[in-house]
């Protein structure tokens, strides 16, 4: 029988790997954004996005831009594809993180 603790840690590893994939896709999206739409890149603080002095309110703008699917009217097809990918990965990573939290609570109650 599979240990529940081992299953929990496997779920944590899968969540961490998907987070890394999400951040990598977000970086690639910002590179494409810098080339195809410099004004939007500046609007979401693309240059300082992954730095300690980045502006969280501008970072949230990009998240809401993608969440609301406002990119669908953009002129660059590659940018639209990257936004779709980042959106799907964000939904997957959010669901996995939620599952990890629920699993942790269940593990604490069960053991």
Swiss-Prot record:
Keywords: Cell inner membrane, Cell membrane, Membrane, Transmembrane, Transmembrane helix. It is a multi-pass membrane protein. Its main location: membrane. Residues 22-89 are cytoplasmic. Induction: By growth arrest in general, by carbon, phosphate, and nitrogen starvation as well as osmotic shock and oxidative stress. This is Universal stress protein B. It is found in: Cell inner membrane. The keyword Nucleus does not apply. Belongs to the universal stress protein B family. GO terms for cellular component: plasma membrane. Residues 111 are periplasmic. HAMAP family: UspB. Overexpression of uspB causes cell death in stationary phase. The gene is uspB. One of its GO terms (biological process) is response to ethanol. It comes from the Bacteria. InterPro entries: Universal_stress_protein_B.
